[in-house]
C-alpha cells in the first residue's frame, strides 16, 4: 500500500458518501473509514493492519469502480468490507487475514426478506449490522437497499449486492454482535 484516504467517526457521522466522493476526486483506489473509539494498527513491514477498539473499520476498494456524478450520481463496482475489532487484513489488496468470527455464508441465521428503506424505522442502522444481519447472514437476501433523503428531498440509494466473493463472519461479545463482512 503506497497511499489511501482515511476518514474518521465514519459510521456515527454517516461518512460513506463523503469518502467515496473524495476517492473519486483524488483517484485513490483505497479508502479507510474508521469508527469512533477505534484505531487501525498498521504494520507496514508485515503488509497488514488490525482493528483496535470498540468499532469497525470500513474498507473501500475502488480498483474497478466506475463513477458518474451527474444527476443522479452513480458509483458502481465499488467493493466494500467492514472489519470488526481484533480482525486483521492485508494492506495491499484489503483481503481478510484472520477473524475471530464464525462464517455466515452457507449457514445463514436469518431467512426473512429484509425491509428495503432507510431511517430510524429500520433495525440494524449501523453499516456492519445492515450488511451482516440483512445481507450476508440472511439466505433470503442477495441485494440490500438503503435510502437517505436530505432536506431538499433528494434521495440517495445505496445498493449493496452479495457476490460469489462476499463473505461474512459473526461473533458475539456480551450483548453486542460483531460482523466482519468482505466484498
Please place each PLM-identified region on the residue numbering.
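C-terminal and late-domain segments of enzyme folds
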Residues: 1-183
Amino acid at each position: 500500500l503506497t497511499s489511501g484516504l482515511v476518514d474518521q467517526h465514519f459510521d456515527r457521522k454517516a461518512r460513506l458518501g463523503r469518502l467515496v466522493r473524495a476517492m473519486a476526486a483524488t483517484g485513490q483506489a483505497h479508502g479507510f473509514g474508521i469508527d469512533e473509539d477505534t484505531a487501525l494498527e498498521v504494520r507496514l513491514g508485515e503488509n497488514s493492519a488490525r482493528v483496535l477498539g470498540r468499532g469497525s473499520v470500513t474498507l473501500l476498494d475502488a480498483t474497478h469502480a466506475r463513477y458518474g456524478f451527474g444527476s443522479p450520481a452513480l458509483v458502481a463496482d465499488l467493493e466494500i468490507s467492514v472489519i470488526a475489532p481484533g480482525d486483521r487484513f492485508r494492506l495491499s489488496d484489503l483481503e481478510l487475514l484472520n477473524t475471530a468470527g464464525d462464517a455466515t455464508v452457507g449457514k445463514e441465521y436469518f431467512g426473512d426478506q429484509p425491509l428495503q428503506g432507510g431511517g430510524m424505522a429500520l433495525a440494524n442502522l449501523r453499516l456492519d449490522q445492515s450488511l451482516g444481519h440483512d445481507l450476508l447472514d440472511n439466505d433470503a437476501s442477495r441485494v440490500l437497499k438503503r435510502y437517505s433523503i436530505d432536506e431538499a428531498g433528494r434521495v440517495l440509494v445505496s445498493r449493496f449486492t452479495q457476490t460469489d466473493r462476499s463473505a461474512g463472519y459473526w461473533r458475539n461479545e456480551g450483548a453486542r454482535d460483531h460482523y466482519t463482512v468482505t466484498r
